[in-house]
A protein has these predicted regions:
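Residue-level recognition of the GNAT/N-acetyltransferase active site
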Residues: 8, 21, 115
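Ligand-binding pocket segment of bilobal, Venus flytrap-like solute-binding proteins
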Residues: 7-10, 14-18, 26-94
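A conserved helix-loop-strand patch within extracytoplasmic ligand-binding domains
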Residues: 1-7
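Short beta-strand->loop
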Residues: 88-106, 115-117
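Structured segments of extracytoplasmic/periplasmic soluble domains
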Residues: 62, 66, 81-85, 117, ...
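Conserved C-terminal helix/tail region of periplasmic/extracytoplasmic solute-binding proteins
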Residues: 167-204
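Mature extracytoplasmic/periplasmic domains
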Residues: 110-178
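Short helix-loop capping/hinge motifs at secondary-structure junctions, enriched
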Residues: 23-30, 118-124
Length: 204
């Protein structure tokens, strides 16, 4: 892969995935020799990269044009725009195995909730009702720029609003399998030390 890969420079995500690549749990303390394992992986990934950018459109374009064969890291949220435009050869892939209970990916689920403020507004609950309506749920899933599954798709009234191309764009066919191979997002315990190492290797 040397010279045939890219790094999508979403640094916080890359720190987690580089830890997993180094056979480490990103959500447990990483110290001493394990930090050197992390450094070695960061050095290898950055050293072999042809392209570094924080522009997912540029990265997908390089993939489609054959300039690179893969990029580190991404997911449904980065692959879906290209897939929806017809480039279905672009696909987010979760490792088959990994160092934490056999899992090698990370997933996060965003929730909208009402916060228990001392002086709550009734508008919060109105908003929750609004965003869970089928048409708004669909609009949230396909907000321009990146497309993602939403939990409301468990409701048949929401799911029925998606056509086959939209479901294919967000890789609905493999969602359950990808989720089963992924850790839930947590706080990266040693983030300060790891981002420092990451930044050093990115600049070298």
């Amino acid at each position: 892969m040397k010279g045939r890969s890219g790094v999508l420079t979403y640094d916080n995500w890359n720190v987690m995935h580089m830890a997993l690549t180094a056979d480490l749990n990103p959500f447990a303390p990483i110290e001493g020799g394990n930090q050197e394992k992390f450094r070695s992986v960061a050095k290898s990934i950055f050293g072999g990269a042809k392209l570094l950018t924080d522009d997912l459109v540029a990265m997908n374009t390089a993939l489609i044009n054959g300039e690179i064969d893969a990029y580190f890291t991404g997911g449904t949220y980065t692959a879906s725009p290209a897939r929806f435009d017809g480039a279905t050869q672009v696909r987010a892939i979760t490792p088959n195995s990994g160092p934490v209970d056999g899992k090698g990916g990370v997933v996060w689920v965003e929730l909208t909730s009402v916060v228990n403020n001392p002086d709550p507004s009734s508008l919060g609950e109105d908003f929750l009702e609004f965003v869970q309506a089928p048409d708004i749920s669909k609009a949230v899933a396909f907000t321009e720029g990146t497309y993602n599954p939403v939990s409301q798709m468990g409701d048949a009234a929401v799911m029925s609003l998606f056509d086959a191309d939209e479901l294919d764009a967000i890789q609905m066919d493999s969602l359950e399998e990808e989720m089963s191979r992924s850790l839930d997002y947590q706080v990266v315990t040693s983030y300060d030390a790891l981002i420092d190492i990451y930044t050093q290797e990115r600049r070298s």
